[in-house]
Amino acid sequence: AVCVLPGSAGNGLAPGALAEIVDPLPYVANVSNITASEVGADTESDGELAERIYLFPGSYSTAGPEASYLYHAKTYNANVGDVVVASDQAAGSVEVYFLLDDGSAPGPEMVTGLQNYLRDRQIRPMTDLVTVSAPADVLYSIDLVYYINRSDSNRAVAIQRAVNAAVDTYITWQRTIGRDINPSKLAERVMAAGCKRVELSAPAF
């Protein structure tokens, strides 16, 4: 199936949602998608383009440096966000882990697509066995109580919204491969939202 709208508008359609045959084929009575639609990407931001320009010189190498794999991974699709490359030189294997630009884990089609792209003979050295995977999730919970100044009681609803936004921002910030769970960053963001004091039970060091 091909989405008629550009960008990510066609992502997230559940299995079975795509069932209309546009170009009829002999002996094909019906069709249906078996996985959620994905891979559609919006135009990359200026920051993402600047990062690819910075990594571009690494693409000239055919020796398989880290910068080359980073560049090609981000070139594959504008939705590719954080990328980490690891290698076992003795085994000749290269492992590429990545997240989408919103911090979420990629779906199986995205993983397979990037792996096939990086395994192209024009990209990988002949001695490299490239494997692409989504990183393992690290689960954590958020449990906190915040207090505001009595003089700010008329702003309680606005502060509540700001605190919720601060928590969401922290969750997005935390979605980086290899980044430690940092409670101090959460407390810092919640305090900046207008709180007087924060008691943070989880996450904890």
PLM ranges: what are they?
Residues 58-179:
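Carbohydrate-recognition loop of C-type lectin domains
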Residues 6-14, 133-135, 139-141, 172, ...:
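Immediate N-terminus of the mature polypeptide
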Residues 160-205:
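An aromatic-glycine-centered, glycine-rich loop/turn in mixed alpha/beta architecture
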Residues 4-8, 24, 34, 101-103, ...:
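Generic structural motif
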Residues 21-24, 28-34, 135, 174, ...:
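Surface-exposed loop/turn and secondary-structure junction residues enriched for glycine/proline
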Residues 1-58, 64:
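Catalytic P-loop NTP-binding/switch module of NTPases
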